[in-house]
């Protein structure tokens, strides 16, 4: 895309508002719009015509003489040098160019945008404006003065070589950034310079055309040429599309010349036209820069140099708009519409309809049908005429280049006038330089109205496309001229190649003009060039056609055109269709991308080979199999031609590529692109290299642009803008031009239709027929226009077979996309690209609707392959299928090029479809396909299509499970590398393109280009029709194509019909496969997303399950006989679940293996088809596996939860696609350790019953399902280990709540087991596996659970069934609590999978917290099934509570709560959850949660002791349970509290930190050293088992202590008081009183960064979270706001508002941020959206601590109360008092609430949601968890110690006390009795 150059406009002197001088009219207009209007005015046009006539007369003669003498010699020399230097240049420049094109592209992208609205301005901004300015000064002055660009170019030989040098160098320089254009133009101000340039440039041109821009420059006979080469390189350097730009320059030059020719044709005065055009060109060149000017002097030269400088500039900057403009103008002139018919479709606003482009394109295609070269030239002439007609406008816009060119022509009019041929060729060449400038010329001429004002905005892409096609044509023509003039044999390929693009442009612009121009060219070439016999023959043919078409064109031009045309004809004879299509594609490419333009130039230079490639590619398109044969033929024929050595190499490569390419269609595209690229490589490897680089970077950016405008003809220019590989561009150009042509000629419209049909996804048969029809039509058009029997015969002969198969092979190549009948077809066309698209893209949107259509499209496009492909699952990846079919043919071809081609092809399609349907399914599919292709390409560099197909399938399969995120990531990374995609689709397409480039990087540059070009072709096709047009529209276009089909031979129609039938069959299969694959991929994608949600939901569900479990435990505790009563209590719920579970388990027993699939299908659908479906599948499979192995592991019941973990592991294994494998392994190991004694079967049973239990529990649990599924998804997403942990947690959580949670069924089953294990200890009966299935409506669940935990339960029963259950629950809950510490990034003891005991619980909890924080369940899950679930639960707890909070609306949570008796569940759960919450500070103390649950349960009963024993076992290092009571020692306010390693760490305002034993509550250590109050502390694991204590103080320091030695290891000095500390990701975050957050590396305590967050207000609290891959830092502040920032750089993402006072505390759970504030409320915000979700009220003072435990939230308040809220219902469940002062800090560990008060007191209170003591005092509704707290409340809050009279307000009590009676004691006793006797609430 010309943007590269424009990025750095040569100087600020060319803003759009700069005054532009029309040299023709002598008028100066201010602003591009005014200038464009002037240019488009009739007066200016008349003047231009007159001047052109003069210039034609002079310039052609001069040019002819020039070409005949010096130019021919220089061309020959340059050709030799070019061929010699091409490889080195290609390599060198490819390297540099690849880089430059990318940044250039990027730079130009903005400029392109500018171009879009002011491309003329752009052009003018560059040299064009200068040209305009300098037009008045005269051509020489213009060159000298007009180019600030010139001045840029002025630096060094490129700038100053003199016109020959400057032109050569200036040209490249001009493009370069116009940096040298001034100098170059200045030095080359004279005609002599022009002549010099002419020679130097011609030779340059030759080598450029042949070898590439750089080689051309390097091969310049002039020293300047090397400078020019350097400038070309610089140009390349300067532009991302540099590589393309040289080609583009060439193409531009050719186009300009062609445009000049067209203009002459338009004028019907070849010489006059040339002169007028040259004048315009000079003016425009003057305006544009010396490039155009020096181009003027010698066409080949001009085109070469102009392309490098002016052309390239225009290519990137002006070229976009100008080429578009030219195309538009040419088209407008020809059809009265803008040449942007195709472009119009993408850019409807284009001032000029795209009919012209359509006409041109159709003409081109028709001409192409007859003879690619002949047609191309006439077409280009038509474009030129069109441009000439439009050029009056465009020329004004382009006037600077045109004027400059004219000036140069005038300046170099000596040369120009020296001979008509020289003049003509110079005109042509100059027009080629003007190709960008001709467009510019057109722009100046019509710029005011057409290009400058109107097109600039919309024309950025449309114009770029249009102009680019023209530019390509011009470039091509220029290339033709210079090669033709310089050396006939050498130039033949160049001429043909140049001509090919030129023809393509003409095709897009106007076949007739092209023909006329071609005649002129032929004449010029004949007179100016020594044509080889073949060339002469071609010339004759061309002359015949040209004379027929455009006898007006000057003889010299005619000769030149003829020579070029002859070459084209020669190779066209071999593969005229291919050449045409390739040229067309080339046209597109060079138009679309500077790099492509350069490629085109390169390819033009190597037109023989390139044309052959085109022919072969086109032929291949027509009939894929025959295409290969014919391509080989064409290649061989081309190889026979003068430039054939390179062509042969490339052809053989292409043939090999064909063999390797997935299918003939792909082969065609690939081969075409490969041939072009190879020709470029050999002839101008520099250019091809540039093309590669530019393609990579520019291609993507341009891709987007192209996508936008690709559907219409203007797409061609856009394609070149896009910087697609030359072959891709050709294909795209063909497609686009076909689209554009639709309006002009029936066959041409058919071409457009065919292209669009590919995109449209019309019937492949129709497409094939259309394409075949198009080809015959094209042949007819070509024949009619170029009356060259040779061409016709050649085309017919070469493509006859292919026509029989699918006559218009090039067309079919184009059709490859159109072949796709549906969007699916388009995808199929892209096959692999589609797969990549599917992988990374929007599977949800794409999967179903797009998949069938896409698949069909694919099949259609790859008709020959489709038959083989139909069976393939991913038939829509027809590329792969085609590869299979064509594999025999393609076996010879290197798979590298095939891969490159495939990936590029996919990229092309992707690009096409991406733009119109960025979010469309097809884009998604294509993106995935492209990604897959990339992978395939990279992986299968030498493999065949079938492996690629399999890879694609595998990728799809993988994508189904993992790909949504993975593919997206890969695509994103690809897209990021390309930096091209603006939208997701664009990104995908671009990424695929980048991948294509990357993949093809292993292949030769040419191959890469070809591959990309292939993609482009497809994509162009797909884009043209599918993205922009609905399938119906595409079908209509296809109908248009049908018209061409009708014209096409009967065999083509028959072949198409057969192919269509094959494709339709394969399409059906593919559609089914696509649907399946997309469904799988979509499911996987959704699953990944949902898994994240599931993770949260599972957390919530786990909390809910805990609540259920708590309810069960409550029942157990209430009856104290946990066995039967608890079973019955929770059994009501659980029995139904059990029934379903038993049924499920029976089913599982019956169908252990099948059940997994069953689960996959029905359970997935039942629970959560997408996210949990996969997870469920995994879980289910383990369940069955476990089921099979259940009998073995039933020995260890202790680890009920562990069996869940193994199941989870199995689930994980089933989920491995979701990256659960690692986790599952860990879980399995840990589970095996833990579950060696634990029967897995019960777990399985639980699971099996789970689906049904889910159903039974479905209503309440469905929401749970979602949460569980989401959590599951999250866990999976987080990491394999996290997934396993998540699964286990899901299992636990899902046990009860996730009955509707099939995704986490394994988890649910284990959770059910856990919960039921706790609730079904009484259910000893259901022990036998047989019993389970049968017994259990109720028992099944219980038995499944109990079996898993039977022995465990029995053991616990022995200890005390209740206790056993409690510990289990508490363990699970502890795990849940552990989840809470997730914030902490310590996975310290999580990996202690072996420990199932309480110690393990603690450690695992801590580790799990850390794990969950890290999202790495690690071996914590393996520690115990319980632990894994628990940590997950903890995550769930935190997440659950959070998710509950964040998802207050989530019914699953609410339902779970409601269904599970919210209060009891909450109470029991609260115990567990609170433990998790406590573990917020430390993971380990969260491990105590199970204890707390047990304690909660045991509080009522004496189970406490048994629970303690079990807990003792589960707590490492702590044999005893933490005890309630107070901790003495602090003398001032306790500011922070944390539990770590079963130790309580507290910091105080007394400047000390104390460590207490949780059991003895004794102070075991004091940390001193701070000189001021210690505000915060943090104990964290550092390395290994080492832990460090960080304390933040008001003395502006953070002290780091060794926990064991209690020595201060390091003191970190800070800028202000340290108010809060937080650690995660091995980073310590410190919030300061000045509003900043300072980060330290925990490993070495080195300061990392300082984030300015809330200054000057202090930071009060910190938290962390994750948003996808982004790490979030949440900062609470005294300014009443919470800021969510990027944890890496502190970038503010969003602000959470709502609090009216200082934020004092925060807790992040899942996606919710719970914040407590001094405004006496707790707010829950969605961290991702910033939305305030909930508000919890009821506090009477500032909320100092917020802790989330599963489904409950525990808050500490300055009103001395700890409150327990239900997250979902906002209900206050409990209140804990007993404090004498304000609560400053709180943590929860093992169901113990540890609070620090302002008076320095610390106390531990057991959190027991099962015990509720209601204050029935009148007007009081507090429910206390401890009787003593109620008593204190009654005595302190409801009674006045100094009461005189006291009336007992207890409900139903009327006792009255008076102080007189001394009844105060009685009153107190009375009230206490109320509290003891009447307050108990049955929970």
Curated annotation (Swiss-Prot):
Residues 139-148, 322-338, 412-423, 461-493, 608-620, 888-906, 958-976, 1278-1291, 1299-1312, 1333-1346, 1457-1481, 1502-1513 have a biased composition (Polar residues). Residues 52-67 have a biased composition (Acidic residues). One of its GO terms (molecular function) is RNA binding. SUPFAM superfamilies: WD40 repeat-like (SSF50978). Phosphorylated by FYN in vitro. PANTHER family: ZINC FINGER PROTEIN 106. It comes from the Eukaryota. The lineage of its organism: Eukaryota, Metazoa, Chordata, Craniata, Vertebrata. Interacts with KNOP1. Interacts with TARDBP and NUP107. Interacts (via N-terminus) with RBM39. Interacts with the SH3 domains of FYN and GRB2. It comes from Homo sapiens (Human). This is Zinc finger protein 106. The modification Phosphothreonine is found at residues 1021, 1372. The keyword Zinc applies. Residues 1035-1045, 1349-1362 have a biased composition (Basic residues). The modification Phosphoserine is found at residues 422, 590, 641, 661, 859, 861, 864, 893, 937, 1025-1026, 1031, 1249, 1279, 1281, 1284, 1302, 1328, 1370, 1468.
């Amino acid at each position: 895309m010309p943007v590269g150059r424009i990025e750095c406009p040569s100087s600020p002197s060319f803003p759009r508002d700069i005054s532009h001088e029309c040299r023709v009219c002598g008028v100066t207009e201010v602003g591009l719009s005014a200038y464009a209007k002037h240019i488009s005015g009739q007066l200016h046009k008349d003047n231009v015509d007159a001047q052109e006539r003069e210039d034609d007369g002079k310039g052609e003669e001069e040019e002819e003489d020039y070409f005949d003498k010096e130019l021919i010699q220089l061309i020959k020399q340059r050709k030799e040098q070019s061929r010699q230097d091409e490889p080195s240049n290609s390599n060198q420049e490819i390297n540099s160019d690849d880089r430059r094109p990318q940044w250039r592209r990027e730079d130009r992208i903005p400029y392109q945008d500018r171009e879009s609205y002011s491309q003329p301005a752009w052009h003018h901004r560059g040299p064009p404006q200068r040209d305009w300015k300098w037009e008045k000064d005269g051509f020489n002055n213009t060159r000298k003065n007009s180019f600030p660009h010139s001045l840029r170019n002025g630096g060094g030989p490129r700038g100053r070589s003199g016109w020959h040098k400057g032109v050569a160098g200036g040209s490249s320089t001009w493009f370069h950034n116009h940096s040298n254009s001034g100098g170059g133009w200045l030095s080359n101000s004279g005609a002599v310079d022009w002549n010099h340039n002419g020679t130097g440039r011609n030779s340059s041109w030759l080598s450029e055309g042949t070898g590439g821009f750089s080689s051309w420059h390097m091969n310049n006979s002039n020293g300047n040429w090397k400078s020019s080469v350097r400038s070309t390189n610089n140009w390349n350097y300067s532009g991302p599309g540099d590589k393309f730009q040289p080609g583009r320059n060439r193409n531009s030059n050719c186009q300009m010349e062609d445009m000049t020719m067209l203009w002459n044709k338009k004028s019907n005065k070849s010489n006059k036209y040339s002169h007028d055009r040259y004048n315009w060109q000079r003016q425009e060149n003057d305006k544009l820069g010396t490039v155009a000017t020096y181009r003027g002097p010698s066409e080949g030269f001009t085109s070469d140099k102009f392309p490098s400088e002016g052309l390239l500039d225009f290519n990137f900057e002006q070229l976009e708009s100008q080429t578009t403009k030219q195309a538009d103008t040419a088209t407008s002139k020809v059809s009265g519409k803008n040449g942007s018919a195709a472009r119009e479709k993408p850019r409807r606003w284009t001032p000029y309809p795209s009919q012209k482009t359509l006409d041109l394109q159709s003409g081109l295609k028709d001409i192409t049908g007859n003879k690619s070269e002949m047609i191309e030239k006439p077409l280009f002439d038509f474009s030129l005429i069109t441009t000439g007609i439009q050029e009056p406008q465009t020329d004004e816009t382009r006037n600077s280049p045109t004027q400059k060119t004219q000036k140069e022509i005038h300046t170099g009019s000596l040369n120009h006038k020296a001979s008509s041929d020289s003049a003509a060729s110079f005109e042509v060449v100059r027009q080629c330089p003007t190709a960008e400038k001709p467009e510019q010329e057109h722009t100046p001429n019509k710029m005011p109205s057409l290009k400058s004002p109107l097109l600039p905005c919309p024309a950025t892409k449309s114009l770029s496309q249009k102009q680019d096609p023209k530019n390509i044509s011009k470039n091509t023509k220029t290339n033709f001229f210079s090669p033709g003039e310089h050396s006939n044999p050498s130039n033949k390929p160049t001429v043909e190649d140049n001509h090919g693009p030129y023809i393509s442009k003409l095709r897009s612009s106007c076949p007739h003009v092209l023909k006329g121009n071609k005649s002129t060219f032929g004449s010029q070439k004949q007179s100016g060039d020594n044509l080889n016999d073949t060339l002469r023959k071609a010339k004759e043919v061309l002359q015949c056609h040209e004379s027929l078409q455009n006898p007006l064109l000057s003889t010299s031009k005619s000769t030149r055109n003829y020579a070029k045309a002859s070459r084209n004809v020669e190779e066209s004879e071999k593969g005229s269709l291919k050449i045409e299509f390739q040229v067309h594609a080339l046209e597109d490419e060079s138009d679309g991308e500077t790099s492509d333009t350069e490629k085109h130039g390169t390819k033009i230079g190597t037109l023989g080979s390139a044309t052959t490639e085109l022919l072969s590619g086109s032929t291949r398109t027509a009939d894929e199999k025959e295409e290969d044969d014919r391509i080989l033929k064409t290649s061989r024929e081309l190889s026979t031609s003068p430039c054939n050595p390179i062509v042969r190499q490339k052809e053989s490569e292409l043939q090999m590529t064909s063999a390797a390419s997935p299918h003939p269609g792909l082969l065609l595209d690939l081969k075409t692109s490969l041939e072009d690229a190879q020709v470029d490589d050999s002839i101008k490897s520099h250019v091809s290299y540039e093309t590669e680089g530019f393609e990579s970077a520019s291609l993507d950016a341009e891709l987007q642009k192209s996508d936008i405008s690709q559907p219409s003809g203007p797409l061609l220019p856009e394609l070149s803008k896009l910087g697609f590989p030359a072959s891709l561009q050709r294909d795209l150009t063909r497609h686009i031009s076909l689209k554009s042509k639709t309006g002009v000629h029936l066959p041409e419209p058919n071409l457009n239709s065919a292209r669009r049909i590919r995109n449209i996804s019309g019937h492949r048969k129709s497409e094939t027929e259309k394409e075949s029809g198009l080809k015959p039509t094209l042949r007819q058009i070509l024949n009619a226009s170029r009356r060259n029997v040779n061409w016709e015969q050649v085309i017919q002969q070469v493509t006859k077979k292919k026509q029989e198969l699918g006559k218009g092979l090039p067309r079919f190549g184009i059709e490859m996309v159109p072949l796709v009948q549906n969007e699916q077809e388009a995808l199929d066309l892209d096959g692999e690209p589609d797969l990549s698209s599917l992988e990374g893209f929007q599977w949800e949107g794409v999967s179903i609707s797009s998949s069938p259509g896409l698949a069909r499209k694919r099949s259609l496009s790859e008709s020959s392959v489709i038959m083989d492909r139909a069976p393939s699952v991913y038939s829509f990846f027809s590329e792969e299928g085609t590869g299979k079919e064509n594999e025999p043919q393609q076996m010879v071809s290197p798979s590298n090029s095939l891969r490159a081609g495939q990936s590029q092809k996919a990229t092309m399609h992707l690009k096409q479809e991406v733009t119109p349907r960025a979010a469309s399914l097809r884009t998604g599919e294509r993106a995935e396909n492209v990604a897959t292709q990339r992978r395939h390409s990279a992986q299968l560099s030498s493999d065949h299509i079938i492996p690629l197909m399999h890879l694609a399938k595998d990728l799809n399969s993988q994508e189904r499970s993992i790909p949504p995120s993975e593919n997206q990531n890969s695509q994103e990374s690809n897209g990021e590398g390309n930096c091209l995609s603006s939208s997701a689709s664009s990104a995908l397409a671009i990424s695929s393109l980048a991948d294509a480039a990357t993949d093809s990087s292993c292949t030769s540059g040419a191959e890469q280009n070809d591959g990309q070009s292939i993609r482009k072709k497809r994509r162009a096709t797909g884009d043209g029709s599918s993205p922009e047009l609905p399938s119906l529209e595409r079908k209509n276009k296809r109908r248009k194509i049908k018209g061409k089909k009708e014209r096409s031979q009967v065999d083509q129609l028959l072949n198409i019909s057969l192919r269509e039938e094959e494709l339709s069959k394969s399409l059906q299969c593919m559609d089914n496969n696509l649907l399946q694959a997309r469904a799988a991929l979509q499911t996987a994608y959704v699953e990944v997303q949902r898994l994240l949600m599931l993770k949260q939901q599972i957390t919530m569900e786990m909390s809910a399950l805990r609540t259920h479990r708590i309810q069960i435990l409550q029942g157990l505790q209430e009856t104290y006989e946990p066995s039967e009563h608890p079973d019955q209590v929770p059994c009501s719920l659980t029995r139904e679940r059990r029934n379903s579970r038993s049924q499920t388990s029976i089913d599982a027993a019956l169908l252990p293996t099948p059940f997994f699939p069953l689960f996959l299908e029905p359970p997935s659908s039942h629970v959560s088809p997408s996210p949990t479906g996969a997870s469920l599948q995994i879980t289910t499979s383990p369940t069955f596996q476990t089921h099979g192995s259940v009998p073995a592991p039933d020995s260890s019941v202790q680890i009920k939860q562990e069996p869940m973990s193994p199941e989870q592991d199995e689930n994980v294994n089933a989920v491995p696609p979701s990256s659960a494998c690692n986790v599952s392994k860990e879980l399995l190991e840990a589970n095996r350790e833990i579950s060696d004694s634990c029967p897995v079967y019960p777990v399985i049973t639980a699971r099996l019953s789970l689906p049904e239990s889910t159903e039974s529990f479905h209503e309440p649990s469905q929401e749970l399902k979602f949460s569980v599924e989401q959590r599951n998804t999250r866990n999976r997403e987080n990491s394999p280990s996290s997934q396993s942990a998540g699964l286990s947690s899901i299992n636990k959580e899902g046990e009860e709540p996730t009955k509707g949670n099939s995704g986490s069924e394994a988890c649910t089953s284990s959770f059910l087991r856990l919960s039921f294990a706790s609730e079904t200890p009484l259910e000893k009966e259901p022990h036998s596996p047989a019993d389970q299935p049968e017994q259990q409506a109720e028992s099944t669940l219980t038995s499944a659970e109990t079996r898993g935990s039977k022995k465990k339960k029995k053991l616990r029963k022995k200890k005390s069934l209740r206790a056993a259950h409690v510990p289990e629950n508490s363990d699970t809950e502890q795990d849940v609590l552990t989840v809470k510490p997730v914030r902490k990034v310590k996975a310290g003891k999580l990996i202690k999978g072996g420990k199932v005991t309480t110690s393990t619980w603690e450690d695992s909890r801590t580790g799990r917290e850390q794990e969950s924080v890290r999202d790495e369940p690690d071996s914590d899950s393996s520690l115990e099934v319980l632990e894994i679930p628990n940590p997950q639960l903890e995550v769930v707890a935190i997440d659950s509570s959070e998710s509950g909070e964040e998802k207050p609306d989530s019914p699953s949570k609410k339902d779970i709560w409601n269904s599970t008796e919210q209060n009891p569940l909450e109470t029991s759960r609260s115990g567990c959850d609170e433990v998790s919450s406590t573990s917020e500070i430390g993971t380990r103390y969260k491990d105590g949660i199970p204890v707390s649950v047990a304690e909660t349960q045991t509080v009522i009963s004496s189970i406490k002791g048994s629970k303690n024993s079990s807990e003792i076992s589960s707590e490492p290092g702590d044999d005893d349970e933490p005890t309630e009571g107070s901790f003495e020692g602090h003398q001032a306010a306790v500011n922070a509290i944390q539990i770590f390693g079963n130790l309580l760490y507290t910091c105080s305002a007394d400047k000390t930190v104390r460590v207490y034993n949780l059991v003895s509550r004794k102070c075991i250590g004091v940390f001193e050293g701070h000189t001021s109050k210690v505000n915060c502390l943090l104990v964290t694991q550092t390395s290994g088992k080492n832990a460090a204590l960080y304390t933040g103080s008001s003395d502006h320091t953070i002290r780091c202590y060794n926990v064991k030695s209690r020595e201060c290891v390091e003191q970190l000095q800070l800028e202000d008081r340290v108010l809060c500390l937080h650690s995660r990701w091995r980073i310590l975050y410190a919030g300061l009183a000045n509003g900043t957050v300072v980060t330290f590396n925990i490993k070495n305590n080195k300061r990392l960064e300082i984030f300015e967050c809330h200054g000057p207000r202090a930071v009060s609290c910190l938290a962390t979270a994750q948003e996808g891959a982004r790490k979030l830092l949440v900062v609470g502040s005294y300014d009443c706001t919470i800021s969510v920032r990027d944890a890496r750089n502190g970038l503010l993402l969003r602000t959470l508002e709502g609090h009216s006072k200082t934020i004092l505390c925060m807790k992040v759970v899942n996606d919710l941020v719970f914040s407590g504030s001094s405004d006496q409320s707790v707010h829950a915000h969605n961290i991702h959206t910033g939305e305030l979700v909930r508000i919890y009220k009821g506090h009477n003072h500032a909320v100092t601590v917020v802790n989330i435990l599963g489904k409950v939230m525990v808050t500490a308040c300055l009103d001395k109360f700890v409150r327990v809220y239900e997250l979902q219902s906002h209900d206050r469940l409990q209140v804990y008092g007993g404090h004498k002062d304000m609560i400053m800090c709180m943590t929860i560990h093992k169901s113990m609430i540890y609070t620090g008060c302002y008076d320095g007191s610390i106390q531990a209170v057991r959190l027991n949601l099962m015990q509720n003591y209601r204050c029935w005092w009148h007007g009081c509704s507090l429910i206390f968890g401890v009787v003593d707290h109620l008593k204190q409340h009654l005595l302190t809050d409801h009674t006045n110690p100094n009461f005189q009279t006291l009336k007992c307000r207890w409900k139903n009590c009327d006792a009255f006390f008076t102080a007189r009676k001394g009844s105060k004691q009685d009153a107190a006793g009375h009230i206490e009795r109320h509290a003891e006797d009447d307050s108990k609430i049955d929970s």
